[in-house]
Curated annotation (Swiss-Prot):
HAMAP family: IspE. This is 4-diphosphocytidyl-2-C-methyl-D-erythritol kinase. It is an enzyme of class 2 (transferase). PANTHER family: 4-DIPHOSPHOCYTIDYL-2-C-METHYL-D-ERYTHRITOL KINASE, CHLOROPLASTIC (PTHR43527:SF2). Keywords: ATP-binding, Isoprene biosynthesis, Kinase, Nucleotide-binding, Transferase. Catalyzes the phosphorylation of the position 2 hydroxy group of 4-diphosphocytidyl-2C-methyl-D-erythritol. Pathway: Isoprenoid biosynthesis; isopentenyl diphosphate biosynthesis via DXP pathway; isopentenyl diphosphate from 1-deoxy-D-xylulose 5-phosphate: step 3/6. ATP binds at residues 95-105. GO terms for biological process: isopentenyl diphosphate biosynthetic process, methylerythritol 4-phosphate pathway; terpenoid biosynthetic process. One of its GO terms (molecular function) is ATP binding.
Amino acid sequence: MQLIEKAPAKINLGLDTPYHHQDGAEEWNMVMTSVDLADYVEIQTLTKHKRIRVASDSGFLPNDQRNLAFQAAHLLQTNYGIDEGVNIRIKKNIPVAAGLGGGSSDAAAVLRGLNQLWSLGLSWQELAELGLQIDSDVPYCVYGRTAHVRGRGERITPLSKLPAAWVVLAKPKVSVSTPSILQQIQYDHLEHPDIDGLLRAIREQDIQGMCAVMGNALEPLTAHRYPEITQIKQQMMKFGADAAQMSGTGPTVFGLCSKQSRAQRVFNGMKGFCREVYLVRPLP
């Protein structure tokens, strides 16, 4: 049996980490939303053996245990005593190591897909709890849409859909290792964004209010290493974005626009600065 699961990219409208736990894991306080840039994950179950095979059309993606989609299949296979193998083929549209959650979204897609193909009957909450063993973004990616994410990534509160908005994504030519950024965190020196204010603006459908309080506590760490992030933000604002911010640990920057015509102008302008530029919309 086989099916295809859509694996949308995510952006962080707000990202804060107020402290870390004794085991070193970060405590997160984030507002995330899915956008209509997505990978497509084809999942085929195999009855002749238990091997897990991962393939993709990206030369930058590992196809072994380092791949989060592989880990998701192995986790379900091991936890539930499944005697079947899996072929996973990923059509990559989301840039790799970009701060857009592509790997986590692929893993979440495998969890959802195999839950169906193997008739496991797991709830999304149960899938999210399993996903936390893979990566802190996987629980959110199981649900998708717009959500408030707390804890180690497992506390997901769905939010109302965003007010009408368009998003321009621009990824510079660098790739960022998330662990290398997290290791640099000095909690006493972080600037904490107004997550409560962002949640209030979303509830009130106030896009200008959202733009005024958006923030990413990790942006200065990545931008210090890769100054092109700041340059991209400046260019987006120059071309007319209502707000511009780094997503995740970077390096992708997104510009939020309240009007489609303005977003198109930002998109056209940014194509002269970055090879990977996308004009997308938040998923409803």
